[in-house]
């Protein structure tokens, strides 16, 4: 298995995995994923084996310290030399859940963001996943300003 960045040819596969992982109101559409890949392919980390993508993480870089709903929809808010790596999705293909795939990709994202000189990483998650992200050093900052998909999210931050 290897971790690589996204290519335009990956969009359909990524959209399928996203759709299988989130309710439609929460997950990114194929069009949204295509827009993100076009603007910041290096902010997609894909775990693949052969031609099969098992998991991926994506999000952009910004100087804004908090994750907002607008960030999900506008890839042009990406600031390549920004201070914070945002994470929008941490997803695993259904056939590969509970194999440690998402953890492996997330560890790589953390290492890459630190090596790039970012201040840290910000993501939002549902309350039931706070413990999962805490094991990587993320701290729960409480309920997020984001109401993406009409869901209550917790903002988690890993500061380097």
Protein language model features and the residues they cover:
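Conserved GNAT acetyl-CoA-binding A-motif
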Residues: 106, 111-125
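A short beta-loop-alpha structural element at the N-terminal edge
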Residues: 2-14
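Conserved acetyl-CoA-binding loop-helix of GNAT-fold acetyltransferases
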Residues: 92, 98-111
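Active-site rim helix/loop that mediates acceptor-substrate recognition in acyltransferases
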Residues: 23-50, 56-77
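C-terminal "cap" of GNAT-fold acetyltransferases
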Residues: 7, 126-127, 136, 146-160
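Conserved acyl-donor/pantetheine-binding loop and adjacent beta-alpha core of acyl/acetyltransferases
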Residues: 56-91, 97, 146-153
């Amino acid at each position: 298995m290897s971790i690589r960045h996204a290519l335009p040819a990956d969009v359909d596969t990524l959209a399928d995995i996203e759709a299988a992982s989130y309710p439609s109101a929460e997950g990114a559409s194929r069009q949204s994923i295509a827009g993100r890949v076009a603007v910041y392919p290096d902010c997609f980390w894909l775990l693949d084996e052969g031609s099969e993508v098992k998991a991926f993480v994506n999000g952009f870089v910004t100087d804004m310290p908090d994750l907002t709903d607008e960030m999900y929809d506008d890839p042009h808010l990406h600031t390549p030399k920004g201070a914070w790596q945002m994470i929008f999705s941490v997803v695993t293909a259904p056939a590969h859940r509970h194999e440690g795939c998402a953890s492996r990709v997330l560890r790589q994202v953390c290492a890459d963001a630190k090596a790039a000189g970012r201040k840290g990483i910000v993501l939002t998650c549902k309350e039931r996943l706070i413990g999962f992200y805490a094991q990587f050093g993320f701290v729960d900052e409480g309920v997020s300003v984001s109401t993406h998909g009409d869901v209550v999210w917790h903002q988690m931050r890993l500061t380097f």
